[in-house]
Amino acid sequence: MAWHSPGRLVFAIAFIGTTLGFSFTASAQSGIASVYTGGRTANGERLQPGALTAAHRTLPFGTMVRVTDNRSGRSIVVRINDRGPFVAGRVIDLTPAGAHALGFSGLTNVTLDVVGRS
């Protein structure tokens, strides 16, 4: 089998993608959520602390994500409009409004599920 054959190419792309942290399935992602504030988001919007928006490293802007707090069981749906978090183990940065709706301040363990696009 040559290196450029379709089977090896798919394997190589999947290996590189998973190494870089991309997901090729619709499965949920779990990790730590944090609260953040700031000025402008990566898509050019002004960060609005009262909005249900969030930062994620790889999901496209406009992706709607259900964030479920694993401790309380509360869920919210946020729109991805920024990049981050840039701290190991964290999977999403939420606005203060998102954290308040989930009932936490600081950090919490969450599960993320993509629910659509805005």
Features from the language model and the residues they span:
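Secreted/periplasmic proteins
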Residues: A2-S118
